[in-house]
Amino acid sequence: MTKKFLSVCVYCGSSSGINPVYADAAKELGRALVKHHLSLVYGGGHVGLMGIVADAVLDAGGEVTGVIPKALMDTEVGHERLTRLLVVKDMHERKALMAEHADGFIAMPGGIGTLEELFETLTWAQLGFHEKPIGLLNVAGFYDPLIEFLRHQTSQGFLRAEHKDLLLMETEPDPLIAELKTFTMPKGVSWLSRQRAQTLGP
């Protein structure tokens, strides 16, 4: 990447899951971010994997920016120890601001909200709205069914292989962070760039 890589937005669950391995992985990711001199951007909550990864970064001396809608802040799920907590009006503004403050993205295990954030970020990359790296931390095979489904979409002609490959996948934080740091968006991958090329011609 030509731009300095200084911060990572982490998408993950507001619950911890039933397997302790997920919480352990969140702690490991938080410590790895600090080790690689990266700040954390996330959804601003103190609960679930969200809170665990934020606490791990803070406990290791790192910086954390949280972005949380006022409605969630009012229910007292906002984290009180963050370096910076931005309170926004709704979920749309939350996602936009998280993306604006991050140089890359990592999705950990989570629920519908985590998947929605991940796929919106991938869609933005596919369309050419950003060229930031997107990683999937596949803890204990959690995302194996999703990875297989993406392959199925590709085999059935609904997802281009180069768009599937925009999602960097690893099982450990360190190699995933290394991939994010060295990622460069391939030329001609974005849908908009292809449309412009077809319109303008050679």
Language-model-detected regions and their locations in the chain:
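Flexible, glycine/proline-enriched loop segments at strand-loop-helix junctions
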Residues: 108-109, 133-137, 164-167
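Active-site/ligand-binding-proximal alpha/beta "capping" segment
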Residues: 93-128, 135, 187-192
